[in-house]
């Protein structure tokens, strides 16, 4: 935040160093958590949250180093911090693991899904930054977003690429999960809220890809669809995980 507000180049290396250290510490935390649990930390919602937060910062660190652009961090890191805090406060280390969750196929399924969510989160953040910058550029007064942020094309490119990658990942994760779920649900897949939520997300992001490529929907319209897709994913998955899901809890 200090780097974003002040724009002082000399702060950049220090900020990146602390960020790298935090990623290393988070990695060690996940390793120790996995050793304690005797499985990948994806067995319940709060394990997934901290794994997702880690994956998100790793992807962001890669983008930051590759693109040499640090401004996205001020929008992304609060999300990461929120997920990790919630996970740390509510994680139950003594909760038994359902038998089906120990299947390697399940872990691969979750890995694809949270990787897709990470891609969609990056798209959401860059789309939001695109709209903020676009709004400021069309206003009479140019402020901090115009001064600190790179071009609109920069954010549009990252957002579109993230959705392309995320769509493939979530489709693969969906197929793997469906293969497992059909055996558990005994043909009643249409009663599983989380599955229906993912199908709706697939439709939203498919609309983004199709309209962008065949109808030329770029810029603001593409950014808005990206934000709608992420908002749907975040709200629906939060509600479903906390209140409605039965089969994904395997109770």
Task: Outline where the language-model segments fall.
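Interhelical loops and loop-helix junctions of multi-pass membrane transporters/channels
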Residues: 95-106
């Amino acid at each position: 935040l200090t780097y974003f507000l002040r724009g002082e180049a000399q702060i950049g290396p220090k900020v990146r160093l602390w960020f790298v250290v935090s990623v290393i510490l988070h990695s060690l935390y996940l390793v120790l958590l996995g050793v304690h649990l005797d499985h990948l930390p994806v067995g319940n919602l709060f394990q997934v949250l901290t794994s997702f937060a880690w994956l998100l910062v790793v992807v962001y660190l890669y983008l930051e180093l590759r693109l040499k652009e640090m401004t996205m961090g001020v929008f992304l890191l609060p999300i990461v911090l929120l997920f990790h805090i919630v996970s740390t406060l509510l994680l139950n280390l003594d909760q038994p693991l359902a038998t089906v969750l120990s299947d390697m196929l399940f872990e691969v399924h979750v890995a694809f899904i949270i990787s897709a969510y990470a891609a969609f989160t990056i798209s959401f953040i860059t789309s939001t930054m695109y709209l903020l910058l676009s709004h400021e550029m069309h206003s009479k007064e140019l402020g901090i977003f115009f001064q600190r942020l790179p071009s609109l094309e920069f954010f549009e490119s990252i957002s579109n690429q993230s959705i392309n990658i995320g769509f493939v990942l979530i489709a693969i994760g969906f197929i793997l999960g469906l293969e497992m779920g059909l055996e558990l649900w005994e043909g009643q897949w249409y009663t599983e809220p989380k599955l229906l939520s993912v199908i709706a997300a697939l439709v939203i992001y498919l609309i983004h890809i199709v309209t962008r490529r065949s109808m030329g929907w770029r810029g603001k319209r593409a950014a808005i669809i990206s934000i709608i897709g992420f908002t749907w994913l975040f709200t629906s998955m939060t509600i479903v995980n906390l209140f409605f899901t039965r089969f994904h809890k395997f109770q």
